[in-house]
């Protein structure tokens, strides 16, 4: 049994519906669960013996403001090596041209590349207050091998991140309408068999689980219908969640191919419900949003790609008004060069403000955007044990010193600050499952520079030396160092 007392927080944003902020509080944690939350816990809990055990670790948090840990509901970790490639900017290419350029690069990925891409992405998320992350790993190229998600769990264990792994796939060949090279295609049977293997080996259904598996075919437009039908059947048999991309520009192709809009297509194949959440959704109409609410289907809103792609802005006010579960995701590095989920809170808020005059429903309050990144993410992942700071919830939180110059004049309302002002850099502390995994610019027990050097070395060996990638990097006008 491990007990830790986090003592002396200046403020604590609970993340509850009421927006409760507590002043001068401690958090008492036992085996990853919050068992006490309030002022002067050593004194108030002493009569019942709580926190009096031998060996209680005390962590001084004086001057810090605590927030519930952020929950990332959509990412593609494997794309870390295509960041900051200006020749691949969406502003210069149509979608098909972009796909023709980017997917041959993705096909270079091997097992080491997946591992180090995952370390890089997870570490950046943690530095900015993320405590739980879902990754949609659909890249199974010929070079990758069958154990890519296994290596992602290795990375999560190294860093201490709570991890939901999405085992994705592409099953439709290019000859039948897919835009993805056949070298990255799998059969439905191969995909489903590996989902079963991963669930058997890694999925933990218990409260406070650190690792879970999600069945996540990539998109209806690049998969056979039976891939989705059988995915839904298998996931419900195994008791795990489902995820895919939807409403991100594929609807015209779906109507042309099947005579159905994307969401209707999914509903007719059993791929909606309280165990399903969908990435993006900027194409969803009022009728679609009503169906999402009626079926209990969630949405992962990724604001950063909207700026890059110039697409429609997901109607978050309408979804909120309808009661749709909404969480936030950073998305992959190919459409968001950053893994900073805290930044996405402010981006999402600003996007909705930009579109406010065109919307039927008002923009949610700034605090609601923090809740989408916390409780909303927990709801999408079906994790009632996460998303807020309260007794009985997981001890996942981050903390920031709001007395710095960049927050002066704004720190009177810590609830609204993440959306209105944003955090200017890494947080001061991130705690996951009751353990400090990031504090004062360091990953305890790990050498960040060594992690960076190892990843860079693999990227140089596997990716940057390839003639195609070398040409793309030269296209920036800068000689790679």
Swiss-Prot record:
Signal peptide: none annotated. Zn(2+) binds at residues 74, 76, 245, 331. It is found in: Cytoplasm. One of its GO terms (cellular component) is cytoplasm. It is an enzyme of class 3 (hydrolase). The keyword Transferase does not apply. This is Hydroxydechloroatrazine ethylaminohydrolase. Gene3D superfamilies: Metal-dependent hydrolases (3.20.20.140), Urease, subunit C, domain 1 (2.30.40.10). InterPro entries: Amidohydro-rel, Metal-dep_hydrolase_composite, Metal_Hydrolase, MTA/SAH_deaminase. The gene is atzB. Catalyzes the deamination reaction of hydroxyatrazine to N-isopropylammelide (dihydroxy-isopropyl-atrazine). The enzyme is also capable of catalyzing some dechlorinating reactions. Optimum pH is 6.5-7.5. Its EC number is 3.5.4.43.
